[in-house]
Amino acid sequence: MRLTILAVLLLALAACARGKPEPEKAHVDVSISELQFGPSTVLEQTWLLTLRIQNPNNYDIPADGMKYQIDVNGKFFARGVNNQSVMVPRLGEAMIQVQAVSDLPTLIQHFGDLRRLSQTGINYYMNGMLYSGEWRYPFEYSGAVTPVQ
């Protein structure tokens, strides 16, 4: 009898543990919806980003933080962290406002040759991690701003 009860309990626990897919198989899509220049000093620049977090999974994600880095034309540009909580509904999306920080040498490196950038355009890439308790959701996003001909 004890063996039967133990087997039933183990099966119930296994069923609960399989309620969500493994974090490596689950993912979120994060994209930059808006970018603004924020409060800055000569040595450090703050960028205000509005991020769109899309959840293609069949369960809600109670996100409680994220970290991210932005590269421009293949080189590091800015990074940020955020500990805001946001519920990303199953098969839905949420918007969140965050900050990223760059410094003067990085800014000079990227925008020192504005004439070249106005002809070639700007390619950007963002990667990071969305946190939900002990779960981690890596993300990547890239895009380009092409010059107007």
Task: Give the residues covered by each predicted segment.
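Bacterial signal peptide processing site
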Residues: 17-20
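Intrinsically disordered, low-complexity Pro/Gly/Ser/Thr-rich segments with frequent PxxP/GP/PP motifs
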Residues: 75-109
